[in-house]
Amino acid sequence: MNPNSKHNTNFTNLLKPSDSDIKQFAAQHIRHLTDLLNRYAYEYYTLDAPSVPDAEYDKLFRELEALELNHPELKLPDSPTQRVGGEPLAGFAEVRHEVPMLSLTNAFSPQDENGVFDHAEMYAFDQRVRDGLDGGKPEYVIEPKFDGLAISLLYRDGVLVQAATRGDGTTGEDVTQNIKTVSNIPLRLHGENTPELIEVRGEVLMLKADFVALNKRQAENGQKPFANPRNAAAGSLRQLDSRITAQRKLHFFPYSVARQQDGFVAEEHIQELAYFQALGFSLPNGNFGCFKNIDEVLAFYEHMQQKRPELPYEIDGMVVKVNSLAQQHELGFISRAPRWAVAHKFPAEEALTIVEAIDVQIGRTGAVTPVARLQPVFVGGVTVTNATLHNQDEVSRKDVRVGDTVVVRRAGDVIPEVVRVIFERRPMRETAVAVSDGIGHRQDDLFAETPSANQTQSVPLHKPYRLPTHCPICRSEIEREEGEAVARCSGGMLCQAQRAQGLIHFASRKAMDIDGLGEKQIEQLVAQDLVRHFADLYRLDIPTLQKMKETADKTVAESDQMPSEGSSVGASGKHKKQPVKWAENILAGIEASKTPELARFLFALGIRHVGERTAKTLAQAFGTLERVRRAPEPVLACLPDIGTVVARSIAHFFAQAEQQAMIDELLAAGVAPQTQAVTIPPARHAEPQRWIARLPGFKISENKAQALWELAGKNIEGLQTDKALPTDWQAWRSEPQNAALLENLKTFFAQMPSEDEAAQGSDGINKAVAGKTFVLTGTLPTLKRDQAQSLIEAAGGKVSGSVSKKTDYVVAGEAAGSKLEKANALGVSVLSEAELLTLLG
């Protein structure tokens, strides 16, 4: 046969694989290598029983990399090559948690001088659990409380599709690209019984050995070392360039299932942990367990406290959970924490150091806090140079002085504090003293016939510490009210320290939420006297902001002998101004903050004792800023979660002319707090006998107050004028300030809507929404979750986290999930975002 014949050529072509055949083979081999490498990783990280040497794994890994390089379109979502990182991101996207990531209540077991634990708080926890279960006997699971970052991992059809940080518990950041670089997180779940959807909660951390190695590299590269493994893990996980994250070895340990569809259904938490391991996750084997009673739990806790230094990772306690998931459900939640779990913290770590100086810090409310400046000491995983001394009483009680050797503790492993002084190490000096000669004469007696020999005694080198009498910042007097532990600077907003801290709080995210205006800018504005009051922020313009930045940059340039930031030097040596987009962004943020929710505005004012929760209570009780400004102290004291002390603080704030003027200035500058629906009508809580019993300076029980109210004809005018009332009442009301208070109460109640009026929708309450319970689920087209919640609450509705028979509406967005299914099963009305907005009007 002629080898060059046409038939022979066709036969050769038939033997040559087509492009589609090559691609099919590549796809099959990529799938094979991906599965094989993931299995080897599972054996290595989860089972701790590798079946192949590292060199074999590396060879297969490089083979997979080469295939993916030639066929990037065939790269699988669970490919282990993703663990080396990808291209940098522009920023982290927000992620709304379908199930909030809640915190745990803390419990402490202090040790005495002999190392004996006091477990009273844990026994109290056990009793609360038993009471909640009507005497039932719970089993407990105890597991390490890792000192890392809480992370939520979402798997769909077994593949990791999203990873999010905890954030504020409701909203976190999307860190999926970085999480994929964590070696012991499965990119595809193992096993045959993988769920259709599962959200796994756990902790990302850095092992101690990896932390030491990282800091060594940082030092070798001339970079700042990390303070502790937690900071290193946090900094690594929040890198926009995931290739940097990949270089820093992070670990993950799971601790709970947030939600799940299909797959194995656990009845106990210990079964959940076993399920995690079956799915390919690592567990802290040997460091957790299930126990029959609280005494066994506490014995294991003490064992782990002793074992803590030997662990490969940092832990700051143990988490104790009721094992039965049914019992967990029965116990439920309180506020933002489960009743069925507690974080049992270890005793804080302590170390010795020397007090080099004591000075004071001035807080935004004027609180004067003495602070010990310390010789640097490594304690609780960080280098400590400052420690709080709390107040003058604490300084005096502990007798802390400059030069003292002290025990420093990181209280709760967060805030360093001075625990006690080692008095035998106190620096002393010798001083001459006058002593008796034994006959009754003294050494300093000029008429003594036989003077005694000179004698000396040791006295402390430094005098006892006393707070300064005047503020070191503004020189205003430091005052301390009777019965108060904390002394305060009397300068108010005249004090630069209070002014800066007050403005930082005012602009903060949970207050007015002024986007773009950070602490550094505010500190510069205050230091340069460009802003003195809240309203001054709303008068800022681009020239003022430019002046602030130029002055700040000039200071930096003079100290560094470098051209200032924000300018450039051309060939001629002349400075060219940069664009002012940054200033425009700040002004846009200020403008956007002009219509805050009433609760945010009240919180922003910085009223003493008024946190977010109290501010929300005030908004829900009074509805408008004007009503809050005029609310009498006895009415405030009747509201939920407020009480006498907080009520007095609120009333005192609004009684000051300068505070009212400050609010008027804000209103004049265009700030307009939104009207809030009255969902906690004062009439419901401030019944006559209750507010009468809370009148300042008049002691009376609620029963007697009720009798007084009836004697007065059940009206305030009778209380003001009836001459047949008891003489002690008549004496009280004759005082001018008390007469004014009664008049204020009469006017206030006359102008407040009744409970019925509030329920019927007066004062802006939406009749269709007031009193209704809403549940939000899924991603809405235009509204963020907190925006939708604010709109509902402003109209008088309530937002719940779970669907029940008491739910009136479920507002469903994209990927609504199990809440939508439950709503349909219970026959609860389901609304789209558009339908919600229509309902809200």
UniProtKB/Swiss-Prot annotation:
Compositionally biased region (Polar residues): 561-570
Catalytic residues in the record: K145
InterPro entries: BRCT_dom, BRCT_dom_sf, DisA/LigA_HHH, DNA_ligase, DNA_ligase_AS, DNA_ligase_CS, DNAligase_adenylation, DNAligase_N
Keyword tRNA processing: no
Cofactor(s), names only, from the UniProt record: Mg(2+); Mn(2+)
Keywords: DNA damage, DNA repair, DNA replication, Ligase, Magnesium, Manganese, Metal-binding, NAD, Zinc
Residue ranges of every copy of the BRCT domain listed in the record: 764-841
One Gene Ontology term of the molecular function aspect: DNA ligase (NAD+) activity
Catalytic activity: NAD(+) + (deoxyribonucleotide)n-3'-hydroxyl + 5'-phospho-(deoxyribonucleotide)m = (deoxyribonucleotide)n+m + AMP + beta-nicotinamide D-nucleotide
One BP annotation, GO: DNA repair
CDD domains given in the database record: BRCT_DNA_ligase_like, LIGANc
First and last residue of the signal peptide: none
GO annotation, cellular component aspect: cytosol
Binding residues for Zn(2+): C471, C474, C489, C495
Disordered: annotated span: 554-575
Keyword Transcription attached: no
Enzyme Commission (EC) number: 6.5.1.2
NCBIfam families assigned: dnlj, PRK07956.1
Function: DNA ligase that catalyzes the formation of phosphodiester linkages between 5'-phosphoryl and 3'-hydroxyl groups in double-stranded DNA using NAD as a coenzyme and as the energy source for the reaction. It is essential for DNA replication and repair of damaged DNA.
Similarity comment: family membership: Belongs to the NAD-dependent DNA ligase family. LigA subfamily.
Name listed for the protein in its UniProt record: DNA ligase
Native species: Neisseria meningitidis serogroup C / serotype 2a (strain ATCC 700532 / DSM 15464 / FAM18)
